[in-house]
Amino acid sequence: MNPVEEMLAQAPYLRLDAELTVELLTRALREEVEKTGFRKVILGVSGGIDSALALFLCARAFGPEGVLAVCMPYRESSPDSLKDAREAVEVVGVESVTVDITPQIDAYFAGFPDASPLRRGNKMARERMSILYDL
């Protein structure tokens, strides 16, 4: 038995009906977006599992034509992350754009050269949020 099977044997309540879970999540997404009056969603895609799952669920909920995926790398971002993000976009078949955040981030931190990596990471997250709102 592999570790996941062992865990599920000890805690059977962790088992999920994948089809039902996807149906419930996509229905919830549609209902919440419809409340806003929007018919299309914009989603930041990083190449990680969280954004890949969100991308899959949004494509299921709104159809590929109802999703815009946005990749927002920084010059020090892992090339593999951008590659993974682009692969996820290709698999689900949605429209995508890439916005390089390097110019904005570097210009901002030129005034704060001693900023910690945590502070830089937080600024990048806020910059990405601003870009998503502006699209």
Q: Which stretches of residues belong to each language-model region?
A:
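ATP-dependent adenylation/nucleotidyltransferase module used to activate substrates
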Residues: 1-135
